[in-house]
Amino acid sequence: MLRRVVLSRLYARLGGPAVSAGRGGRRGVASSVPPSGSTSPRALNIFDRELKRKQKNWAARQPEPMKFDYLKEEIGSRIADRVYDIARDFPLALDIGCGRGYIAQHLNKETVGKIFQTDIAEHALKNSIETDIPTVNILADEEFLPFPENTFDLVVSSLSLHWVNDLPRALEQIHYVLKPDGVFVGAMFGGDTLYELRCSLQLAETEREGGFSPHISPFTAVNDLGHLLGRAGFNTLTVDTDEIQVNYPGMFELMEDLKGMGESNCSWNRKALLHRDTMLAAAAVYREMYSNEDGSIPATYQIYHMIGWKYHDSQARPAERGSATVSFGDLARLNDTMSQGKK
């Protein structure tokens, strides 16, 4: 199911209310587990993970990082809503790629007893939002989780997995650390994210420079995501799509916000710089092709939401093929008989 939400990024409101959180559960300090910049041998090395760590650290060190948290807080709240929908308690939870703790701030200690938060950016962990849930922050890579098998009742992840080089391995790691009958609830950017910006940059660069380079990072297709979750061992899968449209004053304000979110491109094949006239042309193309009636420009963020369970004997299972005792033909005849009886 596709839902679209439209938000407005109004720069007059940059100094909005700061996020507050209780201090009932004092968080632990970051552990000595270092983030890994390497990838597994089978992975394509698409992203510069060290650059992504620097980008996220830079964003977390800004004087008011909450100015750029609007999208991540929105998705964090939606993941928390899905956790509450499960209607059970989770004594031990894990947030992978937590950033400043965008999911935990929307959870409560009645539902989650204790949470471990991991990220590759140490400054994001140091500046994470405090909640009343006992919290331990650990510096760790999404592809190399430092936890034993069958540890967590719940694993969550919000807008982080689209930057890993080996998504299959990351999902396998999540499945590995979950307890039997544990659940993974996550969200990541989808393939149509920022299509307006991608198209505008490509058209302008082709016109001005005779070709174009990728300036928007590649994203996973929704059909592939369900397959990868199943291959990692998850069952009872749910994958759905949201679109969030945010309106900005212009293209340069959009790019400034992406930098403030720590979401700038970190692909190895990225072009370091674009010429000034190419950027101005891209901004003009963006406004010409996509602008709203009020002069603002929209940016679309496609979100893939996913839920997957680790197998347990208590879970419902599909019946074996050929075990049915009633055919569809029998049901059709029964329906006809009941219809005639009503007449």
From Swiss-Prot:
UniProt entry keywords in alphabetical sequence: Membrane, Methyltransferase, Mitochondrion, Mitochondrion inner membrane, Oxidoreductase, Transferase, Transit peptide
Enzyme Commission number(s):
1.-.-.-, 2.1.1.-
Q: Organism's domain of life?
A: Eukaryota
Targeting presequence: 1-29
* Transmembrane annotation, as ranges: none
User: What is known about what this protein does?
Assistant: Arginine hydroxylase that mediates hydroxylation of 'Arg-111' of NDUFS7 and is involved in the assembly of mitochondrial NADH:ubiquinone oxidoreductase complex (complex I, MT-ND1) at early stages. May also have methyltransferase activity.
GO cellular component terms, semicolon-separated? matrix side of mitochondrial inner membrane; mitochondrion
* Organism whose genome encodes this protein: Rattus norvegicus (Rat)
Q: Which gene encodes it?
A: Ndufaf5
Q: Determine if Oxidoreductase is one of this entry's keywords.
A: yes
- CDD domains this protein is in? AdoMet_MTases (cd02440)
Please give the name of this protein. Arginine-hydroxylase NDUFAF5, mitochondrial
